[in-house]
Regions:
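Nucleotide-state-sensitive switch-loop elements of NTP-binding domains
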Residues: 39-87, 115-116
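Interfaces that engage single-stranded nucleic acids at replication/repair/recombination sites
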Residues: 1-12, 16-19, 23-25, 34, ...
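Phosphate-binding/switch region of NTP-binding enzymes
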Residues: 20, 127-217
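Short, basic, glycine/proline-bearing loop/turn elements
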Residues: 12-19, 55-65, 114-122, 159-160
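Conserved P-loop NTPase nucleotide-binding/switch module
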Residues: 90-126
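Hydrophobic positions on the alpha1 helix immediately C-terminal to the Walker A/P-loop
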Residues: 28
Length: 293
């Protein structure tokens, strides 16, 4: 074991935009994506709402219909990676949690079908699936902008012997602790396209509401690119897979690559190509073909 000096490396954007319905999350995400630049893709679970903004930016869209299982989101993320997009907007990740076929609904189904209504046991099955969804976002080679619907969180208190419901603020409709996954979380103020950072590792956003614009994306990109060069871990992993001498060797190299870099489409393609090569029947020489005849 050896400790080394901490260095901030170049990174990809991991941004969450939260806000109530109609606050402009999709619009804001597209503005920021424009500032980052490159090919933009949108996973749209909001019934075509992203396409309403086709006039303001050039982007491709995948309209994702129910069921909103974690696996369908992972598949969509991998499809965007394989198509070579630079920025992916997931609009919105709330559906993976509380939408039709999302985690909450899956827990109820599994609890009733297998555990006599015991949701604790059902969560043991769903939590790894939800974790795989988050890992697909966090380990992606693309810049990720995720939107999440927020709602007013309330609590019941007692004052002078009387029960009273008090507002605690806005909370994203996703699993608790979601904010820890992202570099920055911007909470959109309903009145206009302004946002307040509820979490910010970049130090770019103060405590006051700031307008969301194309410049927001450019500023974030400058910060992301100002770090030191990252070590290329993908190339040696792909080379190890492509040069595997046996199927067992291939499996070990593939599992090591997934553990390090996640289930990326390039890794999967390299594994499948090498597997076909290793399992293909050997080519017959001319004398062998004559003998076989």
């Amino acid at each position: 074991m050896k400790f080394e000096k901490a260095i901030r490396m170049k990174a990809k954007l991991r941004l969450a935009l939260t806000g109530p319905s109609g606050s402009g999350k999709t619009y804001g995400a597209l503005l920021i994506a424009q500032g980052i630049g490159g090919k933009i893709a949108v996973i749209d679970t909001e019934k075509g709402s992203a396409s309403l903004y086709a006039h303001m930016a050039e982007f491709d869209v995948l309209e994702l219909d129910p069921p909103y299982t974690p696996e369908r989101f992972v598949e969509a993320v991998q499809a965007a990676e394989g198509a070579g997009y630079n920025v992916l907007i997931v609009d919105s990740i709330t559906h993976e949690w509380s939408g039709v076929g999302g985690c909450l609904e899956l827990v109820d189904q599994i609890a009733n079908a297998k555990y006599r209504g015991n949701s604790w046991s059902a969560w043991n099955e769903i939590t790894p699936r939800h974790r795989a969804f988050l890992d697909a976002l966090m380990r992606s080679p693309m810049h990720i902008i995720a939107t999440a619907r927020s709602k007013t969180e309330t609590a019941q208190t007692e004052q002078n012997g009387k029960k009273k419901v008090v507002k605690l603020g806005m909370k994203a409709e996703q699993r608790d602790g979601l904010e820890y996954e992202f570099t920055t979380v911007l909470d959109i103020v309903h009145e206009g396209h302004f946002a307040v950072a509820s979490k910010d590792r970049t130090g770019l956003f103060g405590g006051d509401p700031q307008p969301i614009s194309v410049e927001t994306g450019k500023t974030l990109l400058d910060w992301l690119e100002s770090g030191a060069e990252t070590v290329d871990q993908l190339t040696p992993a792909l080379e190890a897979i492509s040069n595997a001498a046996t199927v067992d060797n291939l499996r070990k190299h593939y599992e090591a690559a997934v553990e390090l870099l996640g289930e990326r489409i390039e890794i999967k393609r390299a594994k499948n190509a090498r597997y076909r090569e290793l399992t293909a029947p050997p080519e017959q020489t001319a004398p062998e073909q004559a003998d076989a005849a």
